[in-house]
Amino acid sequence: MAQSVPPGDIHTQPGSKIVFNAPYDDKHTYHINITNAGGRRIGWAIKTTNMKRLGVDPPCGVLDPKENVLMAVSCDTFDATREDINNDRITIEWTNTPDGAAKQFRREWFQGDGMVRRKNLPIEYNL
């Protein structure tokens, strides 16, 4: 049973943070490469702390071992002098898919008692 084994590692490029540069009167897009470094198929999903400002595409998916996906993180226009820009981040969550499951993302994989791993990527805004 896949859920009894902890999910393996993922690698992201960039590895530790996402940086958006001013001005913020135009939409910015930053690309992140996510690689499944483990030996099992995983389901992954992205969460953001600021749904109004930050968008992700695709927001979830399935990766076989050693497979990767290029994901776009977009930052919509905003007034950096009036809004709090200190605590934004995206969180990548991933878990092993059940044995024999189709390669189609299912939200319920994250709602059972299997282990879910997380990686936080803080957002840095250069003014």
Swiss-Prot record:
Supply the InterPro entries for this chain: Ig-like_fold, MSP_dom, Nematode_MSP, PapD-like_sf
Q: Where in the cell is it found?
A: Cell projection, Pseudopodium; Cytoplasm, Cytoskeleton
Its Gene Ontology cellular component terms are:
cytoplasm; cytoskeleton; pseudopodium
Q: So where does this one cross the membrane?
A: none
* Coiled-coil spans in chain: none
Q: Where is the MSP domain?
A: 9-126
The tissues where this chain's protein is expressed are given as: Sperm.
Major localisation: other
Instruction: Report the Gene3D superfamilies cross-referenced here.
Output: Immunoglobulins
The alphabetized UniProt keywords are: Acetylation, Cell projection, Cytoplasm, Cytoskeleton
Positions where N-acetylalanine occurs in the chain: A2
Purpose of the protein? Central component in molecular interactions underlying sperm crawling. Forms an extensive filament system that extends from sperm villipoda, along the leading edge of the pseudopod.
Name of protein: Major sperm protein 1
